[in-house]
Amino acid sequence: DFKDEEFGINEMRNFVLKHEKSKLVFSVTFSYPANMTLETIVETIREKAKNMEVTCVQHYFPVKFEKDCPMVSLLSKAYEKITHLDGTPVTTTGGTYAKLMPHIVPFGPSFPGQKGIGHQPNEWMKIEDLNTNAKIYALGIYYLGML
């Protein structure tokens, strides 16, 4: 049971089970909180799956920025200026694109009532919210340009 107060719980998704060269291969994608290590997760899986070979094929470290770092503060400021809502940053175990390049803050504003709509089948967003996001991104880029 891996969890972190800020990031939430470890997520497992993209399950694939296939037969390969007389072996049954089970693949899964994990997104895990920054307070965990890959080694801890792999060891836990090995303990639970004693008769199976466990291999990490690809790994990206979790992304974590302090809430008061300049980039996060400016993006929060842009959110608050456009929405007039509390822009206190929250985090998840996602942010895949930010794991591929250093110094990229994963930023995707969400609005009240939108919990859990991202990365789901038939992902959706209201046109009004899409327009609000565009305004937030534009102002955020403007603010970041002042760093």
Report the location of each language-model feature:
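An extended, acidic, His-containing surface patch that forms the Zn2+-binding/catalytic region
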Residues: 1-13, 18, 35, 53-147
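C-terminal catalytic subdomain
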Residues: 23-38
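Short amphipathic alpha-helices in soluble, non-transmembrane regions
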Residues: 39-50
